[in-house]
Amino acid sequence: MPLPLLLRTRNDLRMEFYDLIVGVEQAETSPRPVVGVIVVVSGLAVSFLLWLLYVHHASADFAQRWMFLPALNAFLNGLCAIALCVGLYFIKHRNKEAHRKSMLLAFAFSSAFLISYIVNHTLHGDTIFPGHGPVRTLYLSILASHIILSIVALPMVLTTFFFSLTGRFAMHRLIARVTFPIWLYVSITGVVVFVFLKAYAY
C-alpha cells in the first residue's frame, strides 16, 4: 500500500476512534433539553418574523430610508451560500479546521442577514411582487418554499452547530446531511427572490 494512502487511512481511523470516544463521553449527558430549548426559541423567533411580515405595518416616515437593505440582504445570502459550498468542499477533503471556519462564517453571514432583514421589514414592511401571469406563480412558488424551509432551517442549523460544538460528531454528521441542502436552498432562493423583485420593480 502506498505510504500516503496508508497515512490517510490511519488518520481516518484516528478521527473515527476519537469521534467514537467523544460520543461515548457525551452520551452520558442527554442533548434533549438543549434541543428542546432550541426548538422553543426558534418557534418564538419564527412567530416574531411572521408577525413582522403579515401584521406589522411600516411607518410612511421611513419609506425612503435605508433603501439599500434589500440588496444587502441578497448580498449576505449570496456570501452565505458561497461559504456553505466552501465548507462542503473542505469537509469532503477531510480538512475539519477549514470546514469549521467556513461554516462559522456562513452562520455569521446568516445572522447578519437576519438582523438586516428585521430592520428592513420594520422600516419598509413587505414588498409586493408586481408581476402577473406565470411569472407571478413561479415567484410565489419560490417565495413559499423559501419561507417554509427557512422556518425549518433555523432550529436545524442551531442544532447542527450544537452537536458540533459539544463534540457529538456522529449526530452532527447525521443531521448536517439534511441541514446543509435546506440551508443552501434558503440562501440561494433569498437571492433569487431579490432578483425577481428588482427585475419587475419598474
Regions found by a protein language model. Give the residues of each.
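Alpha-helical membrane insertion/targeting regions
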Residues: 6-7, 12-202
